[in-house]
Amino acid sequence: MLWFQGNSMQLARSSFGLFLRNCSASKTTLPVLTLFTKDPCPLCDEAKEVLKPYENRQPYKDQKLPGTRRRRSPSSPSHPHMASQSGKRYNLTLNQVLSFDYDMGLDAPKTISSDCGAFYCLRMFKSPDMTCCFYPKQ
C-alpha cells in the first residue's frame, strides 16, 4: 500500500510541474514574423509555402507593398544571399535562411538581397530583432 501511495504522489508532483510549465509557456508571446510581399512575386510565394508548416508555431503577418519601383544594389548577385555584420557573404536558399543556426559560432547574418525590384523582409525566428530582406527578380 505504501509503495502504491508513494508512486501516485510522485506522479501527481510531476503532473503538477508539467501543468505549471505549460501555463507559464502559454503566457510567453512569440515575436511575429513580418513578411513584406509584392504581387506578382515568385520568391514571396515560395517563402509563404516554406512558412506554411510553421503557422501554428510561429505567427507571421503578410504585409503587401505598393508600387513597382526597381531597387538595385551594385554589389549584389542575381540570387539571394546573406551578408553578416562583418561583411561575410553566404549564398543560401530560402530554406537554409529560415533554418540558419545562430549558435554555430558564425556572425549573425544581417541582410539578404539580390539585384531586383520588389523586396520583402523576414524577421528571423531565433533573433527577432534581425530582419532579412530579399530582392527577387522580376
Curated annotation (Swiss-Prot):
Transmembrane segments: none annotated. Residues 55-88 are annotated as: Disordered. Residues 55-64 have a biased composition (Basic and acidic residues). Disulfide bonds join C41-C44. SUPFAM superfamilies: Thioredoxin-like. The keyword Acyltransferase does not apply. InterPro entries: Glutaredoxin-like, Glutaredoxin-like_YDR286C, Thioredoxin-like_sf. This is Glutaredoxin-like protein C5orf63. Belongs to the glutaredoxin family. YDR286C subfamily. Keywords: Disulfide bond, Electron transport, Transport.
